[in-house]
Curated annotation (Swiss-Prot):
Keyword Ribonucleoprotein annotated: no
InterPro entries the UniProt entry points to: Class-I_Fumarase/Tartrate_DH (IPR051208), Fe-S_hydro-lyase_TtdA-typ_cat (IPR004646)
Protein name listed in UniProt: L(+)-tartrate dehydratase subunit alpha
Source taxonomy: Bacteria, Pseudomonadati, Pseudomonadota, Gammaproteobacteria, Enterobacterales
Biological source species: Shigella flexneri
UniProt keyword Nucleotide-binding, yes or no: no
Length: 270
């Protein structure tokens, strides 16, 4: 059992860690993203595509050198939290994450993206009603905490769609829906993009699973062979669209395609 003074110290420390990490990821791309972009850059054959990739890497380096966000749209912060029921700061974790976002907003600095919809007022802190959004997975009889941070930018979120499929549409319906959205909307989402596909018994669950799928390391595959094959075929097919970096045509369209699913009575929600 923690004393009140020790608990407050732990709260302050965890808040600082999450705030620093959130500020840091706005300036530095994950290693798997950088490695994949290098791979796509080396494989690019169009002169315009090569110029754009060169500009991307120049921008990423300047973000590190200047300690400033790599993109002006730092998005709304989302957390995916897997936490044990015996984690000592479970009761304080929601407020810790909120405070961490407000501190990261100043540290980075992050663009103020939290606007109270009906009041039409920007809170100026990247926090507000339902922001930061937190998705919880509570693990019984466990005292660990795993926190994943996702910056939901307006551009990269643009192709996000949900749809109820008829059971008879099957895998083909999933593929068709993904292609329709990427081919028409990804051009405005700063491609090459990461595609996350969630398949579940409700559109709400599918949407959450699609976000979680994006957090998987690039190049990793679903443990189910059929799902892994679906991911591979989506990636190969989408790249044949030739959307190219920043949508100006090129050899690739996506960095990868990942999927997650939940068991259900039919394959009808995406």
């Amino acid at each position: 059992m923690m004393s009140e003074s020790n608990k407050q110290q732990a709260v302050n420390k965890l808040t600082e860690i999450v705030a620093n990490f959130t500020a840091m990821i706005s300036t530095r791309m994950p290693d798997d993203v950088v490695d994949k972009l290098k791979q796509l850059k080396d494989a690019e054959t169009s002169s315009m595509g090569k110029i754009i990739y060169h500009t991307m890497f120049d921008n990423m380096q300047k973000a590190i050198d200047l300690n400033r966000p790599a993109c002006q749209d730092t998005g709304e912060i989302m957390f995916f939290v897997k936490v044990g029921s015996r984690f000592p700061l479970l009761g304080e974790l929601q407020s810790i994450l909120k405070q961490a976002v407000e501190e990261a907003t100043v540290k980075a600095p992050l663009r103020h993206n939290a606007v109270e919809i009906f009041d039409e007022v920007n809170t100026g802190k990247n926090t507000g009603s339902g922001v930061p959004w937190v998705t919880w997975d509570i693990i019984p009889d466990n005292d660990d905490a795993e926190i994943e941070v996702y910056m939901a930018g307006g551009g990269c979120t643009l192709p996000g769609r949900s749809k109820v499929l008829m059971p008879s549409e099957g895998y083909e319906g999933v593929v068709k829906f993904v292609f329709e959205n990427i081919s028409t909307l990804a051009v405005n989402a700063c491609p090459p993009v990461l595609v996350g596909v969630g398949i579940a018994t409700s559109v709400e669950t599918a949407a959450v699973l699609s976000r979680k799928a994006i957090l998987r390391p690039i190049g990793s595959r679903h443990p189910n062979p059929k799902a892994a094959e679906l991911e591979l075929r989506l990636e190969e097919g989408l790249n044949r669209l030739g959307i190219g970096p920043q949508g100006l045509t090129g050899n690739s369209s996506v960095m990868g395609a990942s999927s997650r699913h939940a068991a259900g009575s039919c394959r009808s929600h995406l």
